[in-house]
């Protein structure tokens, strides 16, 4: 199982065309072993992006069942909640809820991505889709 952490980072970014700076808050989803590892991976990512003056504002554990990246059609991150009824022979049906983090260019394409993932293997219902504040995923 993935240990996913949401890491909020604050830094100053130069404004285009002026000498001023603007405050930027970004949220990174980090696959890490611990809070310390999540912070270390975030610091390494910020250094790769040549951002040296920043502050890790908060770190919290996230409970996503799956994180689906989309290299060809990405851009924004969405939270999706999917409910399914799983039933084995002779047993009562069990409701399973999955929280997904999905990268897509538009909210309308999220349902396509979910149907590609689940397909016809389980009957499911898409409960909710919302825009996430995640800026980037660090593996």
Q: For the regions a protein language model found, what residue spans apply to each?
A:
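Mixed-charge, glycine-accented linear interaction segment located at domain edges/termini
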Residues: 92-94, 98-138
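Short, structured motif recognition centered on aromatic/hydrophobic residues
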Residues: 3-9, 26-29, 38, 42, ...
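Intrinsic, low-complexity N-terminal interaction/targeting segments
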Residues: 53-90
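Short amphipathic alpha-helical linker/capping segments at the junctions of internal repeats
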Residues: 27, 52-65, 122-137
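A cross-kingdom feature marking solvent-exposed beta-strand/loop segments within repeated
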Residues: 13-30, 48, 91-100, 118
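Beta-strand elements of well-folded, non-transmembrane domains
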Residues: 11-15, 31-34, 82-88, 102-106
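A cross-family "folded-core" feature that marks the main globular domain of proteins
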Residues: 4, 8, 20, 41, ...
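A short, charged, amphipathic alpha-helix used as a generic interaction element across diverse proteins
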Residues: 34-50, 106-121
């Amino acid at each position: 199982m993935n240990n996913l952490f949401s890491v909020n980072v604050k830094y100053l970014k130069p404004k285009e065309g002026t000498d001023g700076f603007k405050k930027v808050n970004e949220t990174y989803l980090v696959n890490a072993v611990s809070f310390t590892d999540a912070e270390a991976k975030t610091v390494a990512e910020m250094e790769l992006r040549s951002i040296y003056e920043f502050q890790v504002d908060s770190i919290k554990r996230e409970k996503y069942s799956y994180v689906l990246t989309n290299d060809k059609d990405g851009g924004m991150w969405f939270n999706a909640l999917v409910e399914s009824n799983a039933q084995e022979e002779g047993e009562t049906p069990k409701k399973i809820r999955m929280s997904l983090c999905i990268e897509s260019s538009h909210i309308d394409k999220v349902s396509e991505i979910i149907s590609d993932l689940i397909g016809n293997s389980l009957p499911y219902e898409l409960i909710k889709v919302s825009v996430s504040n995640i800026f980037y995923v660090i593996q």
